[in-house]
Amino acid sequence: EPKETRHDIVKGYVGFKGVPVSSADAFYACMSEYTFTKDDALKLGDVLGWCFNDFEKDPQSLNNKINLDAFQGNFSGWDGSYRPLEKLIKASMNDDSSYKHVSTVYHLILNKDPHAVVKTTFRGTNAYGGVVKQTVAARVNVRTGEVDSILDN
């Protein structure tokens, strides 16, 4: 569903369950994290039920959940590339018009220091005119979707 629809669903759910409106953002983050890190076939009602169970046990527990919309929104629906990393790669290339995306993979680390490692493999022309294949890895802030740093391969 579109982001606005998801926000409306969460607001309606929170109201229906009698949860304070001030907790709506935490519920949204919980729903975002679960739906992005679990099975694609999950139903929002089930996921929000899990969030509600967590909330009933400890209302503060949802404060650790992360809204992954910014991170998720930076992936291209066309080729799966991670746009902020692709932009940095092209900016550092000899001939950015030779850039050809091959693949992008990511690994989420959702601990006390939540971030993602995003790796993009691409082809491009080097300074000598030869086509080379390279992989660049970056540490990404999952809250903002921005690249924090390029990692050594």
Regions found by a protein language model. Give the residues of each.
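Cystatin/cathelin-like cysteine-protease inhibitor module
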Residues: E1-N153
